[in-house]
């Protein structure tokens, strides 16, 4: 990528969401003569959210507090960390995320609302994770309006090991949490050791006392940027 065209916000991985300028690779064509849409089934991802409780973003404040407790003091551009307070939420949708799902509901009503038959029971499904439940509720609010509970039954599926839940495949796959599925994590750690070495050295130059600042700390600090 040419430096003149470089955008930090486009190089942060999955967050924040940036639409593909060339679309999804699926071309839109009109329906063939004599055909019509009679049903619409949708699987929708949750909206923009705050970090999960176990994410490096959420654990970074505790690490800063640990360093300060061990006598480390931050200087220069990092001096703000001496009195910094973490103010992000955890797990739930951001205000933007709620708006995204509401807007999606409105758009889908205009596109497919004519298919809705009030005499036919309609069921929507989500899971017990806060952001999932909030996403479903905001989508249905956009689709049907504030009285959406009169139009659709929202089934909330338990997202825990041992429960049948097609919306949470990780709970049904025995390999999800073992080393067999962790190759990506290993590769990421190896890459961090390379590309963050110089940055870690620069961070240490802005610390006094007992700065046991690691490459992992630099990475965790970096993960806060999208938020």
Regions found by a protein language model. Give the residues of each.
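Signature for phosphate-centric chemistry
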Residues: 1-121, 130-227
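Structured beta-strand/turn binding interfaces of compact recognition modules in eukaryotic regulators
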Residues: 127
């Amino acid at each position: 990528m040419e430096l003149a065209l470089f955008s930090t916000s486009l190089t942060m991985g999955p967050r924040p969401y940036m639409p593909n300028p060339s679309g999804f690779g699926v071309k839109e064509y009109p329906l063939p003569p004599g055909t019509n849409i009679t049903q619409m089934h949708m699987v929708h991802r949750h909206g923009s959210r705050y970090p999960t409780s176990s994410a490096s973003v959420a654990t970074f404040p505790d690490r800063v507090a640990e360093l300060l407790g061990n006598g480390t003091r931050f200087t220069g551009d990092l001096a703000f960390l001496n009195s910094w307070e973490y103010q992000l939420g955890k797990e739930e949708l951001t205000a933007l995320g709620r708006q995204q799902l509401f807007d999606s509901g409105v758009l889908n009503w205009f596109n497919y609302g004519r298919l809705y038959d009030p005499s036919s029971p309609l069921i929507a499904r989500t899971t017990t994770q806060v952001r999932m439940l909030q996403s479903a509720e905001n989508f249905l609010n956009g689709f049907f309006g504030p009285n959406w509970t009169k139009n659709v039954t929202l089934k909330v599926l338990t997202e825990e090991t041992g429960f049948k839940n097609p919306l949470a495949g990780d709970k049904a796959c025995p390999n999800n949490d073992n080393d067999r599925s962790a190759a990506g994590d290993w590769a990421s750690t190896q890459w961090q050791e390379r590309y963050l070495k110089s940055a870690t050295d620069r961070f240490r130059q802005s610390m006094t006392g007992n700065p046991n600042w690691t490459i992992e700390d630099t990475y965790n600090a970096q993960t806060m940027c999208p938020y």
